[in-house]
A protein has these predicted regions:
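An acidic/histidine-cluster motif and surrounding catalytic segment
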Residues: 1-86, 93-126
Length: 126
């Protein structure tokens, strides 16, 4: 599924790493890197930023997904658990390529639109 998401974005040579964790594990990462002491559904750590950005040009970064949070949130999104995991993978990839939703409403709308379009495309093909 990750390869399919990347292909839909035209990133055929790109690589990501995916880590599936529980709420406690993602809370520790959220506190350490974003100073938010609570679990979240997905975290993205881009490799195209910082001192190691040129180390491996095809490596977009790391995506961490809390399976527990995904399960809890799936009903709110009208999805089954796998659908929610796919949505969070898309969300994480969009963050890795520069989309954001913090702050500006326009950025959040663009990201939500792109996320919805990608989700529809990749889930129609499976």
């Amino acid at each position: 599924m990750a390869r399919q998401i990347l292909a839909e974005l035209g990133l055929l040579d790109a690589e990501i790493s995916l880590l599936f964790v529980n709420d406690l594990q993602i809370q520790v990462l959220n506190q350490r890197y974003l100073l938010r002491d609570k679990p979240t559904n997905v975290l993205a750590f881009p490799m195209r930023e910082g001192e190691f950005s040129t180390l491996h040009p095809h490596l977009l970064g790391d995506i961490v997904i809390s399976v527990e949070t995904a399960k809890r949130q799936s009903n709110r999104f009208g999805l089954n658990e796998m659908g929610m995991i796919i949505l969070l993978m898309i969300h994480g990839v969009l963050h890795l390529i520069g989309f954001g939703h913090e702050g500006a409403k326009k950025g959040a709308r663009e990201m939500a639109t792109r996320q919805r379009e990608l989700f529809q495309r990749v889930t129609q093909e499976t």
